[in-house]
């Protein structure tokens, strides 16, 4: 099992978890609350190098986890597909370009900044499944639609 964690509200750990799943490593998890919560709760930590274990990993792509550009272009305006923009408010509004040559969003996308999915506590732990369902449903993100996040 791979347990991913970070000190950024699980933003990068979640991205890494997704990458592992995309390459077929389905035995992975994100540590809720990350390194800071682990440390603050007095859980064991070490500065020793872990002992390397020889393993063989054979990637097996999960193509259903990505949306190709051509597929995205043909899905714009399709009521069966919803684009969910989880970037920052500034990226959504186009006031922050993060180095891109253009700013803005995919037409008709729904915006829910990723911070809406974590609690406003010092560890940014994940909200409960019911809270997440309520947030998503209120934004029109429902199970019968194909959801494309970015």
Where do the protein language model's features map onto the residues?
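Positively charged, proline/Ser/Thr-rich regional signature most characteristic
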Residues: 1, 74-144
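Thiolate-centered catalytic microenvironments shared by cysteine-dependent enzyme domains
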Residues: 1-75, 95-96, 138-145, 150
């Amino acid at each position: 099992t791979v347990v991913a964690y970070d000190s950024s509200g699980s933003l990068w750990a979640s991205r890494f978890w997704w990458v592992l799943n995309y390459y077929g490593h389905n035995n992975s998890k994100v540590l809720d609350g990350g390194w800071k919560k682990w440390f603050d709760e007095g859980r064991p930590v070490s500065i020793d190098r872990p002992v390397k274990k020889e393993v063989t990993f054979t990637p097996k792509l999960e193509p259903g986890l990505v949306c190709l550009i051509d597929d995205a272009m043909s899905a714009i305006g399709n009521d069966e597909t919803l684009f969910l923009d989880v970037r920052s408010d500034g990226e959504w509004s186009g006031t922050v370009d993060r180095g891109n040559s253009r700013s803005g969003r995919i037409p008709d996308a729904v915006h829910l900044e990723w911070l809406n999915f974590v609690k406003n506590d010092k560890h940014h732990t994940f909200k409960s499944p019911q809270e997440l369902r309520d947030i998503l449903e209120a934004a029109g993100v429902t199970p019968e639609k194909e959801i494309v996040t970015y």
